[in-house]
Swiss-Prot record:
Chain segments carrying region Disordered: 1-20
Species this protein is from: Psychrobacter arcticus (strain DSM 17307 / VKM B-2377 / 273-4)
InterPro entries reported in the protein's UniProt record: ATP-Sase_PUA-like_dom, PUA-like_sf, Rossmann-like_a/b/a_fold, SO4_adenylyltransferase_pro, Sulfurylase_cat_dom, Sulphate_adenylyltransferase
SUPFAM superfamilies named among the record's database cross-references: Nucleotidylyl transferase, PUA domain-like
Protein name (database record): Sulfate adenylyltransferase
Domain of life: Bacteria
């Protein structure tokens, strides 16, 4: 499978999703300056953190081939059947709705064709939306379909329930990438930039490793399994908002860099980041992770235990089995499904449930939640949990937080095993 990158050189990488080329919606130069002037005269909608991250993904082409926030037909089709229903993209696979909401008073003042400025919570003008339609949704139905729960304690459900009353659909022009290029200059990469790096390495098969945690020994093991199968691995960190108790992106970046520098061959792995918030949608989010990794040029997505999960809402490997229900023509990027991985005391090495013959009493199952809990409570962390260089960076981070200011980390679901 080949695709054409922005500079039109032949590429061995997978093509973008639903399009022969990326479709970034970010303006620059004179077009940007003119749009900013126009935006200053328009009515405004204030974006949630999640909506802001989605808008930036539109801007950089991460959500190719979408051209804006979904209309009612697309919302319904995606929620119920994971398929877009309107326009040129009708029938295209898409697993999670990408929507914008606004208060009813704002929505009532808008007509099809109107333009509205999209503004971040800090006041920065992020984009312009041309209104296609406004519509209301059944929020609980969306939550049940996407998250398989309507429990308001679920952080993704909470995001949906807290949306404003009316959804606003329309195409967007994106005017800013926010703070990401400045805060994370070494790892924040657009899909086009990532593809250029992968092309320059001559890679064809690339496995993405999705992470919102510093990498512990099981993560390292998963990435090295993928390196044996593919030309290389893209360690792709989420840079947007997380839930309380998760470790900030700058600390994760430093910890992952230390791991790569000390324990990986330098020509087999790349660290990069992307601007989304977590939705914690488990299986459905795993599909979204694969879809937009295709836009970044990745042929595979590493899917281990409890991918994109939270608490005990999902089975340990639900995010793997959901791929079995996706047609081969719907999604080019495929999962690398890897089962339980752990440190085995008898093997004196990392192992998996497919390779280790020893009793479970010999196994030390490592999870990011267990690691965060131990560190946040100033407990000893066994050497087989994480590399010493990584642990030192994380200990230094927690040392800077007063004990009574640390978020409680609970072990539930797969993380408690």
């Amino acid at each position: 499978m080949t695709s054409i990158t922005a500079n039109q050189k032949p590429s061995k990488l997978v093509p973008p999703h639903g399009s022969p080329e990326l479709k970034p919606l970010l303006l620059n130069g004179d077009a940007l300056n003119q749009a900013l002037k126009l935006a200053s005269t328009l009515p405004t909608i204030t974006l949630s953190s999640r909506e802001r991250g989605d808008l930036i993904m539109f801007g950089i082409g991460g959500f190719t081939p979408l051209n804006g926030f979904m209309n009612q037909a697309d919302w319904q089709g995606v929620v119920d059947n994971m398929r877009l229903q309107s326009g040129d993209n009708a029938g295209l696979f898409w697993p999670i709705p990408i929507t914008l909401s606004a208060p009813k008073a704002t929505a009532d003042s808008l007509n099809a064709g109107d333009k509205v400025a999209l503004v971040a919570q800090d006041g920065e003008i992020m984009g312009i939306l041309t209104v296609e339609e406004t519509y209301t949704i059944d929020k609980e139905h969306e939550c049940q379909q996407v998250f398989t729960t309507t429990d308001p304690e679920h952080p993704g459900v909470q995001q949906v329930l807290e949306q404003s009353e009316v959804n606003i659909a329309g195409s967007v022009e994106v005017l800013s990438e926010g703070e990401f290029p400045t805060l994370y200059p070494e790892i924040y990469k657009t899909p086009a930039e990532t593809r250029e790096i992968l092309d320059n390495k001559g890679w064809q098969t690339v496995a993405a490793f999705q992470t919102r945690n510093p990498m512990h020994r099981s993560h390292e093991y998963l990435a090295k399994i993928a390196i044996e199968i593919c030309d290389g691995v893209l360690i792709h960190s989420l840079l947007g908002a997380l839930k309380p108790g998760d470790i900030p992106a700058d600390v994760r970046q430093e910890a992952i860099k230390s791991l790569i520098d000390n324990y990986f061959r330098q020509d087999t792995v790349i660290q990069a980041g992307y601007p989304l918030d977590m939705r914690y949608a488990g299986p459905r989010e795993a599909l979204l992770h694969a879809l937009f990794r295709q836009n970044y040029g990745c042929s595979h997505l590493i899917v281990g235990r409890d991918h994109a999960g939270v608490g005990d809402y999902y089975g340990a490997f639900d995010a793997q089995t959901i791929f079995d229900h996706v047609g081969k023509d719907d999604l080019i990027t495929q999962p690398l499904k890897i089962g339980w991985t752990f440190w085995c005391n008898a093997c004196n090495a990392m192992a998996s449930d497919k390779t280790c013959p020893h009793d479970a009493s010999e196994h030390v199952k490592v999870s990011g939640t267990k690691l965060r809990k131990a560190l946040s409570e100033d407990e000893d962390v066994p050497d087989n949990f994480s590399r010493p260089e990584v642990l030192q960076i994380l200990r230094d981070y927690y040392a800077g937080i007063a004990f009574d200011e640390r978020a409680e980390v609970k072990l539930v679901g797969a993380s408690a095993v």
